[in-house]
Amino acid sequence: MKDLLNLLKNQGQVEEFDAIRIGLASPEMIRSWSFGEVKKPETINYRTFKPERDGLFCAKIFGPVKDYECLCGKYKRLKHRGVICEKCGVEVALAKVRRERMAHIELASPVAHIWFLKSLPSRIGLLMDMTLRDIERVLYFESYVVIDPGMTTLEKGQLLNDEQYFEALEEFGDDFDARMGAEAVRELLHAIDLEHEIGRLREEIPQTNSETKIKKLSKRLKLMEAFQGSGNLPEWMVLTVLPVLPPDLRPLVPLDGGRFATSDLNDLYRRVINRNNRLKRLLDLSAPDIIVRNEKRMLQEAVDALLDNGRRGRAITGSNKRPLKSLADMIKGKQGRFRQNLLGKRVDYSGRSVITVGPTLRLHQCGLPKKMALELFKPFIFGKLEMRGLATTIKAAKKMVERELPEVWDVLAEVIREHPVLLNRAPTLHRLGIQAFEPVLIEGKAIQLHPLVCAAYNADFDGDQMAVHVPLTLEAQLEARALMMSTNNILSPANGEPIIVPSQDVVLGLYYMTREAINAKGEGRVFADLQEVDRVFRAGEAALHAKVKVRIHETVNDRDGGSVKNTRIVDTTVGRALLFQVVPAGLSYDVVNQPMKKKAISKLINQCYRVVGLKETVIFADQLMYTGFAYSTISGVSIGVNDFVIPDEKARIIDAATEEVKEIESQYASGLVTQGEKYNKVIDLWSKANDEVSKAMMSNLSKEKVIDRHGVEVDQESFNSMYMMADSGARGSAAQIRQLAGMRGLMAKPDGSIIETPITANFREGLSVLQYFISTHGARKGLADTALKTANSGYLTRRLVDVAQDLVVTEVDCGTEHGLLMTPHIEGGDVVEPLGERVLGRVIARDVFKPGTEDVIVPAGTLVDEKWVEFIELNSIDEVIVRSPISCETRYGICAKCYGRDLARGHQVNIGEAVGVIAAQSIGEPGTQLTMRTFHIGGAASRTSAADSVQVKNGGTVRLHNLKHVERVDGHLVAVSRSGELAIADDFGRERERYKLPYGAVISVKEGDKVDAGSIVAKWDPHTHPIVTEMKGTVTYVGMEEGITIKRQTDELTGMTNIEVLDAKDRPAAGKDIRPAVKMVGLDGKDLLLPGTDVPAQYFLPANALVGVADGAQIAIGDVIARIPQETSKTRDITGGLPRVADLFEARRPKEASILAEVSGTIAFGKETKGKRRLVITPNDGSDPYEELIPKWRHLNVFEGEQVNRGEVISDGPSDPHDILRLLGVSALAKYIVNEIQDVYRLQGVKINDKHIETILRQMLRKVEIAESGDSSFIKGDQMELTHVLVENERLSTEDKFVSKFTRVLLGITKASLSTESFISAASFQETTRVLTEAAVTGKRDYLRGLKENVVVGRLIPAGTGLAYHSERKRRREMDKPTRVSASEVEAALTEALNSSGN
């Protein structure tokens, strides 16, 4: 009996392991796995259904078909366990062994493994230094390869076709060895001496000059070193023994009607066995060479198809013309082993049902149908029934439950008390898509969901379904309650703002009760306290909207945790006073003394959470909801067709527009305007008309006339149902109301261009047939877009999760002093995001000083909370260096200080938080809200005039930032740098707006000047680029000869003459190489030098420049010598929305990217080559000049003799992130990418915290490229993991050796995921075959550091509560390590001990 118990016990012993290694299997290893050789292609006997002996399902090899029963039935039952039947040869064991026992096939001729042959780069090809084509010709018996040339003139590895082979045979006889097929390849691989080759390559690489050659050699070297280090032998890439999968993993299932369903693998194996047996027979018969060769080739093809069908040639198809599923197909793709069964599994104790509203639930509850609860909690009920003695055995309990006896329901209620369940709605786009609730038993069959969590789930009640899961163990229940309970997830992890916010009906109810109406019943009364208001309202003596005075008692908490009680009389309305009753103590009355629109309610909940804490907020949110529902019911707001009031002015506006359009049409007909201008003007007109109609409509809707209590007619905000819905933010928007009651406006054609004739009707009037037809396109496109968007957005999320999955908070502080410089985010002069918002929840990296002093006001290491934000804004600080995930120096993972605040909890992030996944979810989840389209700039948008001045919006003080300028005689400043900015600060010194100043801008104010709102402080000509002098002197023309390099032209209007420089291709031969310039000379006739340099002040003039000064003229500082006309910039399409975000994360190089200066120095133009300009930058430090060829059509922002700094823009265009990283560094890159991505999301009104984008960026910057290898084992140009290089460099510097130098590399998220250290994670992401091939050849180890790898091997993930488990395991293992001591050490210690005791 004891034996029996042990038998059941030893099934699940746990193997402790820390890493998984993948490698090539040697033939010996394959034989050692095997339980016998499969010799026949038969599967099962069609009459008896018993497996055939030696066949693919043979019971002798793979084990019995039934538990503990041999095939012939001689031995049955457990007592014969382990006996091998002498009659049928089957071991008596569990049938389960048929899932684990493998067999093998001895191949009659070796076969190359297709993965190592065809998966690029071909590993066999690299090792043998042959092209894939050549190897294939050998393998598929088209040519011979020389294996051993002997004393002949042939070379090893040389290919010979039939003719050449026979010629060689005649010439040399048996002196050489040349063969074909996989055996030849195997011989060659076997003959490679790795050590010798590695040495040879290491010597050869430094001596080669060509880049491509070096690349090829270092690839080969890497592969050889990998083979040497991993213990794999090259010849193992050619199979001599083929393993056979256990039969239960490729089942053969009898269907009714005598047919069988079989796994495709059986067909593939059958082909291999058939061909192999035939080949054996042919070899025994010593058949003619040509027949044997053909059979060998067929065997090679059969094995190829088994391993990876369709990789070479046409895929082998089954009876139904469908390609057979090979071993490779089993593991790759969405339906493969990795993604289907290892990363996503189905779980028991779960159910799903439709959801409905549960308006009476509390926030931590959900309604669970009794039927579902009974099924889900069955084991608990059985246990309880037995414990109570209501049932004697589990079987009896089961019967009771099946009969649904009354006591079962009592027990159920007891079992589910405080036992949380998890509710999940697919698609689970972020972690709030699964939350825990306490179940409340309900009748009916639908799950009831609390309305406030709908926003987090993105759920609505139009037929959505949700799944319920039961956490079984105590630990699981604890985690569900502590971490996943809906009441613990009030803030969104994406932006730290409340996600439990009322919407729709609740908002409408709260808005309705806090509106005021003129002359309502009870207006002007004064109440002693809130109770009195309540009584009077219930008695019907005062209306809900009446303006009254109320004495209130409030307790206001301040930031420091203290509170102040005060009593005051406020002017308010009855409704607001009633609402204040549910507001928790600690908040001021002012929070409700306003119409509660959606934004205000959200702010209120946020404030409540920050001031009075979680528990109060949860209770308050529930109360708000109940109140909102109650009052929206009382309000009786509904929509009737008469609520859509069409403005009377509509007809007049449309008629006027139609007249103007006719006017433009007639101008076009008489040729005064072009087609394009007409189109733009018409579109412009109609857009204006549409805006006017909607303005008229909204002003109509939003006001109504009433008589106040003095009998005077006054305007008050309207109580129109539709207006209230839109105004409160409950439902609808001005744009939607415009289509209902205004006019629908302009529509787009399928190609995206706008149709000139708008739809003047609205939905209330109804559309004509033509109007309806025009509008169908847009509607259908919208639906098609949505479907595409969902797929694209999901794919983006998947890539993001994959790149960031192993990023976990692993320590408190990495001790770095680096960080990112945070400044307010400015767009078009306005501050879009003030500094306070950007630093909230971050840790300060370096002390912040009070402006203009040495006093530290915020010490480094401070976590900035709301209190500090106020403080920073009070002290008008405009830049702060904060810690960031990008600059964190933690080796594996990230530290809590660099990450800062956990946005969903409001305090510093805990160790073990999976911040990478949270970042990926936060960015991916709103993906479906982004647009898919590319904005074509057309119509009204393309004609926005180029900016030509800075007009300030707010009064304040002028500040100039890194602006190089010269002062003109009239006192104005002229900008002579490209990156200057002008900012306006308010009286507190806070920056309100900031503008870029182009080169040549004339600035009419100076640093520190006060300006009023609306004043123009700088001006420039947007259509020309001036060349400004920085000194005064006399102009001298150089190389400017009329008719050769220049031409004079007279302006017809003004009569002024201009000199225009001719383009080189328009000049006569004499002028081709002359470079016209304007030189400055002093009074003594000597050349003037540019200030601070020894470069003569001469300005070379590019083609088409207009010179405005005469030869010999005197000019002053800041005068314009010449103007270069700017071609009006081509209207570029702005890629918006989701595609733009994907491009940024994939780090794609844009087309026609902007060109940046590679070094700091002086610009010059060298000799032009065909269609390109040669730009030369001479560095100021005297190093070698840098040259670059730039296409002629690119417009350059720089001119000869100008100073540029490294990374400055030379030619405009979209920025290339790789250039920014290379020239300006990591923080500039971070700033660029964060701002670009935020712009896309901000356009859709989505808030995401910067740190999530930085977290993904950290993962994209994991790799470095080796620039100099030093004494390390790295090869120049290798891409290595940053941490790996740093560890190696530390080791080298302790040994006083030369460390390697490297540059940071930016990888796109797909590439970064595939180049991760973990091959399991990479293989389960994409390109499974390639990843596994590479990992096997190099014998990679996966140390299971990320989350994904651990899910795949079925362990707790090293994040959250799992991190503690992993670190505890590590600690235990360190303790258990045996310490090895040598005998001599023991002896020495003993003598020492004896001596000391002797003394």
From Swiss-Prot:
Keywords, sorted A to Z: DNA-directed RNA polymerase, Magnesium, Metal-binding, Nucleotidyltransferase, Transcription, Transferase, Zinc
Record-listed E.C. numbers: 2.7.7.6
Question: Which annotated residues bind Mg(2+)?
Answer: D460, D462, D464
Listed disulfide bonds for this chain?
A: none
In this chain, Zn(2+) 2 is annotated as bound at: C814, C888, C895, C898
In Pfam terms, one family for this protein is: RNA_pol_Rpb1_4
For biological process, the GO terms are: DNA-templated transcription
> What does the entry's cofactor note say about binding and number?
Binds 1 Mg(2+) ion per subunit. Binds 2 Zn(2+) ions per subunit.
List the cofactors.
Mg(2+); Zn(2+)
Coiled coil (UniProt feature): none
* A single GO cellular-component term on record: DNA-directed RNA polymerase complex
Q: Which reaction does it catalyse?
A: RNA(n) + a ribonucleoside 5'-triphosphate = RNA(n+1) + diphosphate
Q: Where does Zn(2+) 1 bind?
A: C70, C72, C85, C88
| Role of this protein | DNA-dependent RNA polymerase catalyzes the transcription of DNA into RNA using the four ribonucleoside triphosphates as substrates.
Quaternary structure note: The RNAP catalytic core consists of 2 alpha, 1 beta, 1 beta' and 1 omega subunit. When a sigma factor is associated with the core the holoenzyme is formed, which can initiate transcription.
Entry similarity comment = Belongs to the RNA polymerase beta' chain family.
PANTHER family referenced in this protein's UniProt entry, alphabetically: DNA-DIRECTED RNA POLYMERASE, DNA-DIRECTED RNA POLYMERASE SUBUNIT BETA
Its protein name is DNA-directed RNA polymerase subunit beta'
Organism of this sequence: Pseudomonas savastanoi pv. phaseolicola (strain 1448A / Race 6)
